[in-house]
Amino acid sequence: MVIKKPFIFIFICFLICLLICIDLTNCNTINNNNNNNNNNNNNNNNNNNNNNNNNNNNNNNNNNNNNDNNENHKILKDYLKFTKRFKKSEYPTTEQQDFYINKIKKEIKDREKYKNNIENEILKINSQKKRKKFKRKDLNTDIKTNHEQLRKLIENNVNPNPHYYDETQSFYFTNRMTSNNEKNNKKNLNFNNDNNKINNLINIKNNNIPYINNNNNNNNNNNNNNNNNNKNNNNNNNNKNNNNNNNNKNNNNNNNNKNNNKNKKIIINNNNLINNKLVSETSANMTTMVNSGDASLRSLINFLTTQDNNGLRFFPYSPRDLINPFNATKAISVAFAYNDRQLITPGAFSKENEEIRANQSRSQGLFDPNSPNMNFSSFYDIIDQQQTNFVQNIELSIDYLLNQVYFKEIFSKKDFKTQARDFEALFEFLKQQGTRVVYYYIANDGSNHVECGGSIKPCQDLAYLLQSVPMADRIQTDLVVFFYPGRYNITKRIVIDNFSKVQLVGLFGKDETTLTSNQKMFLFNNTHIHMIGLTIADVNFQMKPLLNIFKTDNLGTGTVFDLRQSIMTILLCDFRNISNRNSLGSVFAYNSNLTVSNTLFENTIAAVGGGIFCCSYSTCIVSNCTFRANIADNPIGGGALIASLSTLFITQSAFYNNKASIGGSVIIDGGFSTVDTSTFEYNTGFVGSAIQISPNSIVYIVNCYFYFNLATYSGASIFCGSSTVVFISKCIFKDNYSPGANGLESYSEKLVLIEESVFEGNIPPLLNSTSVVSIASPSAFLFVRQCSFFGHSGVIFNIGNPSVLYCSFSLFYENSNRIVNSFNNGLIVFGSCKLFNNSNNKSDGIFRINNRSNGIFYAVEFYNNTVSSFFESWFNSTCFLLSSNITNNTFRAGSFQVAFSTDIFVDNLLYSNNTAAEGGLISSDQTGGISVTNSLLIGNTAEFGNLVFFRLLSYSEPNCDSFIFENNTYVDNYAFMAGTIVYFDDTIRCNYSCINCVSVNNNAQYGEIVNTGFATFSSTLPNTIPPSIIRPIILQAFDALGLPYLGRSDITFNLLINLLICDQMSLTGVVQSTSTPTSFSVFYNVRISGAPGTHCNLTVIAFLKTFKNITLEYPITVVNCQEGQDPYNIGGVNSYYCLTDVSKTKIAKIIIGISAIIVSIGVLITAILTFIYRKRKIMRYSNPVFLLIILVGCVCGLVSTFVSFSTTSATCSIRMVLIPLFFFIITSAIFIKQYRVYCLIRGVEELHDMSIENSYLLKLQSFILIIPAILIAVSVIATRMHRKYNFDLQKETIQAYCYSKNFYIIFICLALYEFSILLYGCWIVIKCRQYRSFPGSFNEFFYIGVLIYVLTVILVVSIPIGFALLNSALTDFLLYSIPILVLIVAIIGLLFAPKFYFLFRTDKVIANLRQLIEDQEEILKKNKEVLFTYGMYLGDNNNDIIALHESFSDSDILSKTGSNTSDDVSDDFTFDSPTTYSNIPIPLNRRNNNNNNINNNNNNNNNNNNNNNNNNNNNNNNNILNNNKNNNNDDDASSSNSSSTADFEISSSGESGRSSNDYDKRNNKKNRRKNSLRTPILNSLLSPNSRNKTKKRNKSSQNSPLLD
């Protein structure tokens, strides 16, 4: 279609658009002053001029567009990749194609020009200062330098985005145009396009507006865009003027409207609780993007509130719609001036409106929601007007209350006389005014009579007083009842019905007057009542539960006050310790007006509404009150206050420690409510611990403080039910807790607005919460504006179901969890927000947008955050990031984490100085669309892909057609591993290409700008290899581009053999390896084992983390071992190793072999000699059977030694039997022999007879060998020894040794048994050591004792060494051989060698014996002389010679008692001794015998002391010698006897001559000394038998071997 007169057509379109703009401006903009209007007109004129220029340019472009259709179609197809996803059903018209083709061509030219300029400037910069390799510490300096250089360059070639560019922002790239008209045109187009992106998305989602308008040609599109730009510019100017001048809103002249955003403050209890810096920073960040005049916000709000098909309306048009004053019903309050909508009108509490009126005038200044002029601004007008009416009427009501009391000036005075005087003056004043007021007094000491009630004669009972009031006074007079100080017990319920006005006043205030009762106290019906300065306390009773609390005839539902269609004001009162678990609040209001001011509710308990219960179109005003520790016992809840189907206004009040199941402090159930400047602390409940908002309610919460409220389910601060509209402004939420949402939990499908509020948490938190704000209802709208969220450990916004979150001009900092969690078709919009200093230890992003949800982020700043990622989006979701800034952040994954067909659109982004792991900006699975345009990436670091990291494919197929990368700049980016800009984790599925992009100084540690994942590998396996030769195998990995696979360590290589095909080869060593960042991998210490000549294929498998694998096979042949080595099959089937046997060294074998042969010859010779001389007495002396047993044991030991030269399973089993037999045979034989000697010594028998009977020997030895035999049999059966190899693969050596898993149990038992025998034998040897054989006799038991010692030492030494050097073949060989050979040599030397010596050297032995005897005689003679010398010396000193030495001690003799005829008489015995025998006469012939006995005893004692043994044979010999001496020396004996007899006789006669006694004593001592020095004769030493009383040997008995 060709237009012949285009200028006329353009002019008509321009006029139409101008009229539309004027109309929209009049409807939606704010009226400014004349100066601002002039400025706007000038701006509009300028824009109109620009639009004319744009139209001319567009016409010129259209006239110059004459390209070929095929080429145009190709270009258009590339351009529509982005648009194709939104509208696939319709194809653009020819006019639209021409328009887009011309546009694309021009943009391509501009991009090329811009690219060339950038490259030239970069080259200049590099030539001036050589760039260093990127390092993190130089990042800030590099960026600053680059910014300074690039800013000049960009300003010369690029016109930045005009509506968001300022000096604090970095570079935002838009389309590059050079001419002024093109810049202005592009400026308007960009602004319009940005504002329309949200509108287009919403309209397309609901299939209302197509992406491409087919009904208009390209000229009309341009004109419409210009007109829209004019409108937008006007709106922006108006908004700026509005923010600076605080103008009033359009169509509303109310002076009480909202002020500008810069003057807003958050005030709670007259204290500024928000930092001025925070408020100023929040206000300063507001731009024209999101406000009442902005096109994008207006479109979103209009769409959400005016569309009929989306199921969401902005206002709740329900029967209890409290903001619509034009839908009045017949339900009119009969008590006060309110209609059913509860809109307070001006003058409602004025004196002129005291009478009840049936009709009510409309409120002024309100708008009809159904009016066509209803818009976003007028909505706030409704709220502001309603709030203004509340404030005005509350002030009027308080003033009216104080005026009606009449005594506000004298209320606090406690002087009664002063009060009486003031009252008289007041009464006189009232009479002059004509006011009918009647005053009554009540006192505890008053009396009830007809004349009571005055100040002098007060009444006692209030009920009596009210009953006595005349009917006329009830209707026409104001009754004021004063309570004197005291405590009043109300015993009967007081009913006040149809009174005009009753005022109950406590004189001197609430601290002096208290009302109490044990039942319900007051009922007010159709009455105006004031309660001032009273305390109601200690009311405790129970009443029956109420079935229907809303029946009008069911009166008495409140514990203290019941209001029915009445007006009540409570001022300066206290309600304490009131309990009625079946009541509806301490104060119950039904269809009434209740005002409570400066009042305390403490420790009140009720079923529902612990303090106040307002219902059924009541109006409840609570001002400056405190609710503390109130409880609602019924699950309906309302710990402090409930307002049901009523209007509630709370201001400057505090709620502490209240408790209920639902609504720990306040429940709002229907109606319009305002909570202003109040505090909620330490309240608890199941839900809504501070405020519970039930369905069909509209609540305005402003300037409130919520601190440490606890909910066991959710909504610790506020819980909203369905169909509620909630406005939260200038509030602070701090340290609240619930398992759900600790700030706000909403099930409303309508509107929740939060503005200028602070949500503060603790890190670490005292108690963890799931979220801060939670929207659980479908199709809900959450609007957050100018708020701050910091210090939270839970999710801040939890948006479920298809709901909408719009957040603007808000701050998020120092949080440690997600910001948004949205799923199930939710819509998230963030505009002009800042996120900084946040951290997230979880694996998901701080914005989680899943399950077909959409996220739009415009002009958002992210800086100094340490998180896993910013955006996590899965399952067909969409994310838009427009005109934003991401700087100085640290990501554990990447900024975007998307998968499962999720689309990403990034435009005009500054991404700088960020550190990330896999994927700096985007990490995608290639299943969704990606568009990154007009963006700058500078100074970023990542492990892989600073721009995009393409992860492994998910279950969906890749969507390559939707990848768009255009007009981007990449500067100074660095990758720790590979892929500086783009990295494909898998093989390339979609090619990466960037149109008109610039890349400068981007580096990677290992790879290039673009790298891919693992594709294939190669190895260095040889074709032939000996068995088990250590050989490394080197692998190298490659990517899909044929380059080395760099920067990754995620490939696992396995080397294996297919045993099903090749079962004659085995593989050991490090057969698994992991790839390194340098692409190389090594199999270390690989041993391929098999019999020489085996052929097989080795398989190398590369396992990827996607559970995929790549397999390559290599043929290999096993060849023979090297010289000096043999193949050994160790460790398994076909596990051959080329090893050197080092089990027994040659030197050890030679030495042990020669030694064993020599010992064997010695044993053989010994056996032969023993057999030959078996009948000789010297052999019979030891018992030949005993010697034969010893030789048999030696043979077992020698056999085991020779067997140990070969280590096989059979030899191990033989040795396990022979070695224990050897030791136990030897041990048992010598033990029995030694035990025989011990028995002889203990029995004091003839010591020369040490032979053992054969039967005794065999029986005893068999008995000892029973236990070893059993243990050896068990070891052979249960723990059989077998051969085991001990090899060292590094040294390539092998050793064979005997091994049994559980043999150590048998060994321990054998060792314990062996050592028990040996230790007992050692003890016997020690016991027998005192025995000294006669010189020249053969002492065999001495050699046996030595042999026992030797055997014990051998075992004690060898067993620890064997355990210390366990599993050593050489140690095993030596320990089995050396101890056995040493013991056999000891046996031959100690048992057999002495016998052979006696056999072959008899003469020599006798000669030696004689020489020994002669030597002993000489020694005896010398000893005699010494003793005589001692005796002579001691005799002169009158001392007993026997006491000179311990050998002559008579202590043993003196200790004995017995007859004087005993042979054992002490040598020291004298007649002077104090014994019982001193006076007995002794015959003369007995004295010699006594002397002889004394001498004999002395000799016996000497022998015993010297030998330490009771040797009876020596005693007998000494007796013989002494008798001979007595016979040879009769003269001496007679003289000594005579002298002794004389001494005895003198003593017996009783004479006491000292000289004679001394003489006798000296003679007796001489005789005793003489006899004591006598020695045995030599012949007695040589006699084998004793001469005195000894038993002769039988011929069969063996004598000493010397006599043989």
Curated annotation (Swiss-Prot):
Alphabetically, the GO molecular function entries are: G protein-coupled GABA receptor activity
Q: Which residues lie on this side of the membrane: Cytoplasmic?
A: 1171-1184, 1233-1256, 1326-1340, 1394-1604
Keyword line: Coiled coil, G-protein coupled receptor, Glycoprotein, Membrane, Receptor, Signal, Transducer, Transmembrane, Transmembrane helix
Give TM regions: 1150-1170, 1185-1205, 1212-1232, 1257-1277, 1305-1325, 1341-1361, 1373-1393
Task: Name the source organism.
Answer: Dictyostelium discoideum (Social amoeba)
Annotated segments matching region Disordered: 38-72, 213-263, 1457-1604
Gene Ontology terms: cellular component? membrane
- Coiled coil residues, start to end: 98-133
In what ranges is there compositional bias, type Basic residues? 1563-1572
Residues with attached carbohydrate: 285, 327, 359, 375, 489, 498, 525, 577, 593, 624, 768, 837, 841, 851, 864, 876, 885, 888, 913, 967, 991, 1097, 1109
Location in the cell reads: Membrane
Which lineage ranks, top first, belong to the organism behind this chain?
A: Eukaryota, Amoebozoa, Evosea, Eumycetozoa, Dictyostelia
**Membrane topology annotation:** Multi-pass membrane protein
Q: Name one Pfam family in it.
A: 7tm_3
Q: Does the keyword Transmembrane helix apply?
A: yes
Recorded protein name is Metabotropic glutamate receptor-like protein R
Q: Where is the signal peptide?
A: 1-27
Compositionally biased, Polar residues: which spans?
1573-1584
The residues on the Extracellular side of the membrane are: 28-1149, 1206-1211, 1278-1304, 1362-1372
The main location is membrane
Tell me which InterPro entries the record gives. Answer: GPCR3_GABA-B, GPCR_3_C, Pectin_lyas_fold, Pectin_lyase_fold/virulence
Q: Does the keyword Isomerase apply?
A: no
Family per record: Belongs to the G-protein coupled receptor 3 family. GABA-B receptor subfamily.
Stretches with biased composition (Low complexity):
38-69, 1471-1527, 1534-1556
